[in-house]
A protein has these predicted regions:
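Carbohydrate transferase catalytic cores enriched for Leloir-type hexosyltransferases
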Residues: 1-174
Length: 174
């Protein structure tokens, strides 16, 4: 989905999804698509996985990111009924899509559990941690980027270990 590409021009999560889409598209009968209208993300500027426009790349103003995110979220919600897809893999933890995907498999990637382990240091991330928990329990599969993250997911969120795949080297070009 659009989330991280609305928020990041550069960054680890957007790079992860860029590389993941690039590698998945090399597999026969596999196609990825990110429903974006506006993004200034560097990694997807040369990809055919989205049909977006840069949004005032040289201008910064209050609310710019929120505006991009709102437009992209509305676009994604409108497209749910128009696209054929087999798996939904959101780029971040906003669960806005849960009432739209029906019984389609949901895969999420959890990078770490820092906000949950040290919540007193990240009070502004309480919403993100809450959403991560909701999605982890709804997900068909969870990708963890390390064994340590997997153990934290099991201990902190109470997720069955069989639901979690550790993929430390998912990205070839990273």
């Amino acid at each position: 989905d659009h989330q991280v590409f609305s928020l990041q021009n550069y960054g680890g999560v957007s790079r992860y999804f860029y590389e993941l889409c690039k590698e998945l598209n090399k597999i026969n009968d596999t196609e990825t698509y990110i429903p974006l209208v506006l993004s200034n993300n560097h990694y997807i500027s040369d990809m055919s996985i989205t049909n977006h426009t840069e949004f005032m790349p040289n201008k910064n103003f209050r609310g710019k990111t929120r505006l991009k995110n709102t437009i992209n979220r509305l676009n994604t919600q409108l497209r749910f009924n128009k696209f054929e897809y087999n798996v939904f893999h959101p780029t971040y933890y906003d669960p806005y899509f849960l009432n739209k995907i029906g019984d389609k498999p949901l895969v999420i990637t959890i990078y770490d559990m820092i906000h949950e382990k040290f919540s007193e240091m990240f009070p502004s991330q309480e919403y993100s941690a809450k959403n991560k928990k909701i999605l982890a329990h709804k997900a068909s599969k969870i990708i963890a980027i390390s064994e340590s993250t997997k153990q934290d997911i099991i201990e902190i969120l109470g997720i069955d270990e069989n639901k979690i795949n550790v993929t430390t080297e998912i990205i070839v070009g990273f």
